[in-house]
Amino acid sequence: IYTAQLTDWSEVGGEPGPIQPFQRNPDSGSQTLFMKLLMRGKQPMTPPTELVQQTMGGLIDGVAAFDGSGSALGYSVYYYASLMYGNPNLKLLAVDGVAPSNESIGNQSYPLTNDFYLVIRADEPADSPVRALRDWLLTDEGKRLLEEENYVWARAGMPQQSAGAGNPFESSSLPG
């Protein structure tokens, strides 16, 4: 769709009608994720100016309100689209039959996820603020706060810690 090879909803199992693919501006974080997770090295088509949105909220509202026909398509970060901003006229689509949810993102059955890591130097002093924050985030209280904020622990919910020989960093996989 975003390479303009498919331009009509009937080509993807929908009712006949043109697909209106909204995009973000090239410098946005969601556009960067779109390029990484969906385009995978392919170049997207140049969209009409009115389909390029400067904010995630603008994209969500633009897709939800576009001419009332349901012909618009867009992308956003799950957390933002469903929990922070939201729009009752927006429908989140399944990918390969898997709908986005905290559960499907956490168990990685939803294919479009992005991991976040907290990385600190292995030689970071034990009393440093960054080590204190990392250690606190890995406590039950820290995990509970992250879950309350709707971050999702990946890989069966367990943070990963590693520091190998010659590796000057310690890392902890945080929910993404």
For every predicted segment, state its role.
Residues 1-176:
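Flexible loop/hinge segments at secondary-structure junctions
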